[in-house]
Amino acid sequence: MIDEKRLSEVISKNVGLRFVEPHIYSVYQNDENMSSYDKMFGAFYDFVACNRFYNRLVWGYWTGDYYSLCRSALASSTDGWVLDAGCGSLAFTARAYANDTRRSVVLLDQSLRLLRIAKSRLIKLNGHVPGNMVFVHGDALHLPFKPQSFKTIISLNLLHVLKGITGMLQEMRNGLSDGGAIFLTTLIENNRFADRYLRMWGKAGEVVPRNADKLFAVFNALDMPVKYRIKGNMAFISSNA
């Protein structure tokens, strides 16, 4: 089990950790720091937006693509810590994590509710939380970790909810050790009917619609070369240090 002492290897010295429950720690003084998921539409999101047929029909990809990306990320190195920034409920990736216990993994999210759902998913698959994994209640936009702590950073579906992504990408790059890699997914406009749906969510303030040119212009400005593939309205991205 990754305990507080082990976590101190990667947690910034000025960050205080609070034990919440077995396998879950928080960087906050109490549980009142809530994400929009906690406050608004969590159950609906987990039931609808995580449905594989919904994602295939509307957005043009299979949720199994997340599993494949996560497996590739975990296999990208044989050593070093892994960070999943904004891990959510592990709706798409729990099986990938449950099947890979070689590397130490920090699963970070600002929603304590989502972390508990993620924990329950791992327990359902494995009978317990794998000893190489720990949950941290914290903000992916202000990573509470020492620089260059992680060999692999994963972040699924976080970029498209941010008005500006430069700061988050810089945070991730600062947290990446030499020879490491970042793996990301984000919804984009891609000349499909679902673009209208994306813009509708944009007007509601839930997502920020971008096309591929606008997205990758930010990576280029940060001198972060990327490899990517696009399926429907989803971009699957990797960037090496």
What are these regions (language model features)?
Residues N157-L158:
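Short catalytic micro-motifs in class I SAM-dependent methyltransferases
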Residues E206-D223:
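Short alpha-helix
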Residues A221-A241:
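Core SAM-dependent methyltransferase catalytic element
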Residues I154:
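A conserved beta-strand element that flanks and buttresses the S-adenosyl-L-methionine
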Residues T166-A181:
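A short glycine-rich, Lys/Arg-flanked "PGG" loop and its adjoining helix->strand segment in the class I
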Residues R6-S76, A91, R95, L114, F183-E206:
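Conserved class I S-adenosyl-L-methionine
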Residues W81-H142:
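Class I SAM-dependent methyltransferase SAM/SAH-binding core
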